[in-house]
Amino acid sequence: MLVLGWLTVLLGVLAMETYVPALRTLSELLDKGVEHSKAKGIDAAALLKERLAPDMFPLALQVQLACHHAKDGTARAIGQEPPKIDTSELPFTELKALIEQTVQTLSTTSAKAFDGAEDRRIARA
């Protein structure tokens, strides 16, 4: 357990209640992007290559990295080898599937797996 002043936070609960809702929101935003592109007659695939700023990654890679960080952080916290990331370009449907697969992976990780995580040294990759 991680002790923050008077507040004790279970790392597993914290991870699940942070990553899962954020990933579900990201999935909904992708749906809105597809709807917007249809309404405006824009190629939806083109949106995946867009960047909010010149020094940012394209949207598709941002989604992949969000999934990777959720899985990677969780794996490292519970003492497992983090999964490899595939950064090949994916269409909207596959990005949504990646998000759902990440949510499922996180959802099947038991809070008990985080026991001792507060004392575990995590090496930077």
What are these model-predicted stretches?
Residues 1-5:
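N-terminal low-complexity segments that are often proline-rich with Ser/Thr-Pro
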Residues 9, 16-20, 92-108, 115, ...:
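Mature, function-bearing regions of proteins
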Residues 8-21, 43-66, 86-95:
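Alpha-helical scaffold segments that form or flank carboxylate-/histidine-based iron centers
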Residues 29-57, 73-87:
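Helix-loop segments that flank and shape redox-cofactor active sites
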Residues 19-22, 26-29, 33, 66, ...:
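Amphipathic alpha-helices that form helix-helix packing interfaces
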Residues 55-83, 102-110:
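Conserved alpha-helical segments that form or flank metal/cofactor-binding pockets of metalloenzymes
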Residues 83-91, 122-125:
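Short, highly charged low-complexity linear segments
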Residues 37-49, 108-125:
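Acidic interhelical loop/turn segments
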